[in-house]
């Protein structure tokens, strides 16, 4: 919990989030959704909002849920109405325990929020008092995200390779959808490509973390959490043919976790549901963000398995697991746009 003191760095960082990323206007109403771990950050956000001429309030949902219990709770209509009627909303609670789909009673609202259409932001506030925030870097990353999104719309072939053996090809002309994801703020951004069925072939060597499985919010398959770090183990190989996961190998314990996921979930999450091209470059994303599983790092792509049979409508199906691939070389129609995790001038 942050001690509520007048730390100028935290106020400067909060102002950038509210004013620049939130694009607030005087007279608007702002809501922060917080719990015990994030309430101090929410207080700072509201103080900044008032200085900018907004009306602001905090909804503390700690007594409503807390920890894993959030996932099993029904929709609370007062919270739902507050979100629907606010001009902008910042969710400061952990995004792997809460999301706007849960609060609003419609799972599709999770993806709507991630795209920024509703001005409902997933705000990773942890460490805000210590961030060495570089506003221009963040804005440049967001601009690159839009440029890459535009390039993909007219692209034909996407190839991802790594020194550790990843060699994956996607026929982009058959993609069901693609989205610029820029509402997980302040540091994160990506372009999410939803590949068409039958369009992905090759091998992914997942040497990074895996996201907590959506249907099993417990142990990640490849955890990278404080006190539970398994990235030193053999990377996991994921083998795709025509967008179907046909096999996997790696550390025996981690492979057994994936075996169990396939057994427990119906329909089994054997589809290549997403290729996430991470455009964020701020080191703060890796230090302060995604702490629940250590995934979604910079200088990565992630490849998701899942059971999305509504392709073109949603990014995240009932089951969805991202696997990070470090230091990728990304080639688009023969042009290298990212080399060993670093974007080139081509994008």
Where are these regions (language model features)?
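Internal helix-turn-beta structural module
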Residues: 288-340, 344-347
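Homeobox/homeodomain signature
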Residues: 14, 194, 265-267, 293, ...
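Structured core elements
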Residues: 203-205, 237-239, 247, 302-304
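Short loop/turn microsegments at loop-to-beta-strand junctions
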Residues: 233-235, 325-326
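Dual-mode signal for accessory low-complexity, basic/Gly-rich regions
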Residues: 231-232, 247-314
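Active-site bordering "gate/hinge" segments
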Residues: 1-234, 241, 331-347
């Amino acid at each position: 919990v942050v001690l509520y003191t007048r730390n100028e760095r935290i106020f400067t960082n909060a102002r950038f989030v509210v004013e620049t990323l939130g694009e607030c206007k005087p007279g608007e109403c702002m809501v922060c959704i917080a719990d015990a771990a994030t309430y101090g950050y929410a207080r700072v956000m509201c103080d900044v909002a008032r200085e900018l001429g907004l009306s602001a309030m905090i909804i503390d949902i700690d007594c409503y849920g807390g920890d894993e219990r959030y996932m099993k709770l029904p929709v609370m209509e007062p919270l739902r109405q507050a979100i629907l009627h606010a001009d902008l909303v910042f969710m400061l609670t952990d995004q792997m325990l809460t999301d706007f789909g849960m609060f609003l009673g419609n799972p599709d609202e999770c993806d709507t929020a991630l795209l920024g259409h509703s001005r409902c932001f997933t705000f990773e506030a942890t460490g805000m008092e210590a961030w060495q925030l570089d506003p221009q870097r963040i804005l440049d990353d967001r601009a690159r995200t839009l440029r890459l999104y535009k390039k993909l719309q007219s692209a034909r072939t996407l190839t991802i390779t790594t020194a550790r053996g990843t060699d994956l090809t996607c026929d982009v002309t058959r993609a069901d959808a693609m989205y610029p994801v820029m509402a997980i703020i302040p540091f994160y951004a990506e372009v999410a490509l939803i590949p068409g069925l039958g369009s992905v072939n090759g091998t992914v060597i997942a040497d990074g973390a895996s996201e907590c499985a959506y249907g099993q919010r417990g142990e990640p398959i490849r955890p990278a959490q404080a006190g539970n770090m398994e990235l030193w183990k053999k990377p996991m190989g994921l083998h795709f043919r025509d967008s179907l996961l046909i096999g996997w190998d790696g550390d025996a314990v981690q492979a057994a976790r994936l075996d169990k996921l396939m057994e427990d979930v119906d329909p089994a999450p054997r589809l290549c549901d997403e290729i996430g091209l991470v455009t964020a470059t701020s080191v703060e994303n890796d230090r302060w963000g995604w702490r629940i599983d250590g995934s979604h790092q910079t200088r990565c792509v992630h490849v998701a398995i899942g059971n999305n049979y509504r392709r073109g409508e949603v990014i995240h199906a009932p089951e969805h697991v991202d696997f990070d691939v470090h230091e990728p070389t990304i080639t688009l129609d023969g042009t290298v746009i990212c080399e060993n995790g670093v974007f080139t001038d081509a994008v």
